[in-house]
Curated annotation (Swiss-Prot):
Protein name: Two-pore potassium channel 2
The record's note on its domains: Each of the two pore-forming region (also called P-domain or P-loop) is enclosed by two transmembrane segments (2P/4TM) and contains the GYGD signature motif which seems to be involved in potassium selectivity.
UniProt-annotated binding residues for Ca(2+) 2: 417, 421, 423, 428
Residue sites binding Ca(2+) 1 per the record: 378, 380, 382, 384, 389
Region named Disordered: 67-109
Record's subcellular location: Vacuole membrane
Transmembrane segments: 145-165, 208-228, 275-295, 328-348
Function: Probable voltage-independent potassium-selective tonoplast ion channel.
Species of provenance: Arabidopsis thaliana (Mouse-ear cress)
Length: 443
């Protein structure tokens, strides 16, 4: 392609292309067959161009997308422009034949939008809509209950001591100290033990005792649901965190830990709760035996008998605390021991219910579905049972949920589903966040 003598390469197609780049014109709708001209061999397309053609449809190769060597080699100065343009772009062979005199439509690239699960904007939206952390709210609520329980306990005991102090002559009692006797009387009355060593002897004190007993029932429930539950939850969370953070390599220790703590479900096993509660009861019994034997100067058998009667709130009245130190220690011991026994009884009942629920769940999951059960599980009556319907049906059979539990959830779903399409979209959620929704629905 080079000229002789002067070395002028003006006829070199590659040099001409680099000095004066061009963009190939779009090919005609019908390809003309070259007859008198030279036929140029179409150059193969690159894999990237083939991928773009399959994804975005037909396109005209631009100067940036075209390969310089391919366009330069495909240019032949001895041939006519019609033959060159007919086979200049090999990708045009993929185009289907169209009708004559009809312009070729360029298909627009299809853009599909997909939600990114790692998009940080979703976290910002969630923070705006739900700024509070449920765990933080639950901990703050528990602390609030504990503070209220402590305040009510102080008010209850202070009021009882004040009334006893003002009417201390209206009680049949072996007096030691008015404040200690009043505190001892309030604790014994609130715990419903009733030794009979301190009894009211006037109208005012009897009315006060009636009021004090009735209020004491409700107050014991507050203590059980508030302070004791909070302390046990703290202990459970501490043990769970310790079990998660420990790196134990021994299989035997792993088996013991899995037997005591269910790390996967994030809770203590009910057998451990019952064992701890019974252990606390045994400690309370032992502490009571020591108080009665060394302080009240009672024999070991009578001390154990009196301790059991006191912890279980039976209180026959044949024994009682008569010394100042004994009544002062009994005021603290009886409050803790009666709460521990009540909690142990609740854990025992919970273990029985948990065992019954496990047996029922095992039975429900083991049985096959009959035609009548299929019809019951088909909630929307469309002739088929979806996975959600199957799960709801099985949970109902296990007595884990009822219609009263499902209806409020469905009512809240209908409020979020603005378009009644049977599904909640992000647009529906953003629209509903601007309006006040009930945080809880009464069941």
């Amino acid at each position: 392609m080079a000229n002789d003598g002067n070395g002028d390469n003006n006829d070199d197609p590659l040099r001409q292309y680099l000095m004066n780049p061009r963009i190939n014109p779009p090919p005609p709708s019908l390809l003309t067959l070259p007859e008198n001209n030279d036929v140029t061999i179409p150059m193969p397309i690159t894999p990237l161009e083939l991928k773009n053609r399959l994804i975005f449809g037909s396109f005209v190769r631009s100067r940036k997308e075209s390969s310089l060597p391919i366009d330069a080699l495909s240019q032949n100065p001895s041939t006519s422009s019609s033959a060159t343009t007919s086979f200049s772009d090999s990708t045009d062979l993929l185009l289907p034949l169209t009708e004559p005199n009809k312009p070729v439509r360029k298909s627009k690239p299809t853009i599909n939008f997909h939600r990114s699960k790692t998009a940080p904007a979703m976290a910002a939206i969630n923070n705006i809509s739900h700024p509070n952390d449920p765990k933080t709210d639950q901990q703050s609520d528990s602390k609030t209950i504990v503070n209220q329980a402590v305040a009510l306990l102080v008010v209850y005991l202070s009021l009882g001591v004040l009334i006893y102090w003002l009417n201390r002559d209206s009680y049949n009692v072996k007096q030691t100290h008015p404040v200690v006797d009043a505190l001892y009387f309030c604790i014994v009355t609130m715990c419903t033990i009733g030794y009979g060593d301190i009894t009211p002897d006037s109208v005012v004190t009897k009315l006060f005792s009636i009021f004090f007993v009735l209020v004491g029932f409700g107050f014991m429930d507050i203590l059980l649901s508030g302070m004791v539950t909070y302390v046990l939850d703290l202990q459970e969370n501490y043990m769970l965190e310790t079990a998660r953070n420990e790196s134990l390599n021994l299989n035997d220790r792993d088996k013991v830990r899995s037997y005591i703590i269910d790390v996967k479900k994030g809770r203590m096993r009910i057998r451990l709760k019952v064992g701890l509660a019974l252990g606390v009861v045994v400690l309370c019994l032992g502490f009571g035996v020591l108080i009665m034997h060394f302080v009240e100067k009672i024999g070991w058998l009578d001390s154990f008998y009196f301790s059991v009667m006191s912890v279980t709130t039976v209180g026959y009245g044949d024994r009682a605390f008569n010394t100042l130190a004994g009544r002062l220690l009994a005021a603290m011991w009886l409050l803790v021991s009666t709460l521990a026994v009540a909690r142990a009884i609740l854990f025992l009942a919970e273990s029985r219910v948990d065992k019954r629920n496990r047996e029922r769940a095992k039975k429900v999951l083991g049985e096959s579905m009959s035609i009548s059960q299929f019809l019951d599980a088909d909630i929307d009556c469309n002739g088929c049972v979806s996975k959600a319907e199957f799960v709801i049906y099985k949970l109902k059979k296990m007595d884990k949920i009822t219609e009263k539990d499902i209806n409020p959830i469905g009512f809240q779903f209908d409020k979020l589903d603005r378009t009644n399409s049977g599904r909640i979209t992000l647009l529906d959620l953003l629209e509903s966040s601007t309006k006040d929704l009930p945080t809880a629905t009464s069941i």
